[in-house]
């Protein structure tokens, strides 16, 4: 009987712990959705056109936050993130210092929009609004860099 006990304990432990092994996969942060992006965009070829897309999505996000529309805010933020991730491919041919400034500002802006996203998911509308104002400041900085080109 003693030889079966370790095997029985190991099997019991494996069965008890196996749900924990996948607990972190596609988790929803208690917001009712997972944070894997399901939004697909086609990034414009030119950086100036990409900037116009960013501005349009920012306006959609602002309107969604004002209306307290979580699904619209989520979708706009996801599209903003996708456009921001497309920037490095558009800046690859630029001078190193210019590329570094634009790409760095895009990363900072992505973090700011992520703050808006999480605040709106939590229905913390004051925080979402203040995070959106930070993002607007980042948009102005990025616009200034792009306008120099």
Language-model segments: what does each one mean?
Residues 50-53, 57, 79, 83-86, ...:
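Amphipathic, well-ordered alpha-helical segments in soluble domains
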Residues 66, 92-95, 99, 121, ...:
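Alpha-helical coiled-coil oligomerization motifs
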Residues 73-78, 99-107, 126-137:
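Short, charged, amphipathic alpha-helical segments
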Residues 83-103:
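Short, solvent-exposed, charged loop/turn and helix-capping segments
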């Amino acid at each position: 009987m003693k030889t079966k006990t370790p095997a029985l304990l190991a099997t019991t432990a494996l069965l008890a712990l196996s749900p924990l092994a996948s607990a972190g996969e596609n988790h929803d942060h208690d917001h009712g959705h997972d944070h894997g992006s399901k939004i697909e965009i086609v990034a414009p070829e030119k950086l100036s056109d990409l900037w116009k897309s960013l501005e349009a999505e920012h306006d959609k996000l602002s309107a969604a936050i004002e209306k307290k529309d979580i699904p619209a805010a989520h979708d706009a933020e996801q599209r903003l993130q996708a456009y921001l991730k497309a920037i490095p491919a558009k800046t690859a041919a630029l001078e190193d210092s210019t590329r570094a400034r634009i790409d760095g500002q895009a990363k900072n802006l992505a973090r700011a929009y992520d703050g808006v996203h999480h605040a709106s998911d939590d229905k913390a509308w004051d925080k979402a609004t203040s995070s959106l104002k930070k993002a607007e400041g980042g948009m102005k900085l990025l616009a200034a860099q792009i306008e120099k080109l």
